[in-house]
Amino acid sequence: MPFYEHVFIARQDLSQAQVDALAETVTGVIGEYKGQVHKTETWGLKQLAYKIQKNRKGHYVMLSAEVSGEAIAEIERQAAINEDIIRWMTIKVDELEKGPSVMMRKQERRGGRGGRDRDGEE
């Protein structure tokens, strides 16, 4: 089966538990189609570059999976129906990335908050 990375942005007013439930819904669809989720990352609440459906921020979630094209079509159909998901993107990749994604490495390097240390150094 081919490899896919699916990223979605959830509304800013959702709790973390609700965002996790959305990720579980996607994982459930992948399981129904005999696929396998290799990695799920929650990137947190981030500022959007522009307003999307009156939201200035959004909860970002990325899933890396090995799944069929029919499952991806169903995931995208459900994302279009769900009002809690404001944007999504699915890409087909040659192989899945080992370890944390670039976004997670950036958060770890910044100490999770993205600000400066008390000494004024980054």
From Swiss-Prot:
<dbReference type="Pfam" id="PF01250">
    <property type="entry name" value="Ribosomal_S6"/>
</dbReference>
<feature type="compositionally biased region" description="Basic and acidic residues">
    <location>
        <begin position="105"/>
        <end position="122"/>
    </location>
</feature>
<comment type="similarity">
    <text>Belongs to the bacterial ribosomal protein bS6 family.</text>
</comment>
<dbReference type="InterPro" id="IPR014717">
    <property type="entry name" value="Transl_elong_EF1B/ribsomal_bS6"/>
</dbReference>
<keyword id="KW-0694">RNA-binding</keyword>
<keyword id="KW-0687">Ribonucleoprotein</keyword>
<dbReference type="InterPro" id="IPR035980">
    <property type="entry name" value="Ribosomal_bS6_sf"/>
</dbReference>
<keyword id="KW-0699">rRNA-binding</keyword>
<dbReference type="InterPro" id="IPR000529">
    <property type="entry name" value="Ribosomal_bS6"/>
</dbReference>
<keyword id="KW-0689">Ribosomal protein</keyword>
<dbReference type="GO" id="GO:0070181">
    <property type="term" value="F:small ribosomal subunit rRNA binding"/>
</dbReference>
<dbReference type="GO" id="GO:0003735">
    <property type="term" value="F:structural constituent of ribosome"/>
</dbReference>
<feature type="region of interest" description="Disordered">
    <location>
        <begin position="99"/>
        <end position="122"/>
    </location>
</feature>
<protein>
    <recommendedName>
        <fullName>Small ribosomal subunit protein bS6</fullName>
    </recommendedName>
</protein>
<dbReference type="GO" id="GO:0022627">
    <property type="term" value="C:cytosolic small ribosomal subunit"/>
</dbReference>
<comment type="function">
    <text>Binds together with bS18 to 16S ribosomal RNA.</text>
</comment>
<dbReference type="InterPro" id="IPR020814">
    <property type="entry name" value="Ribosomal_S6_plastid/chlpt"/>
</dbReference>
<dbReference type="GO" id="GO:0006412">
    <property type="term" value="P:translation"/>
</dbReference>
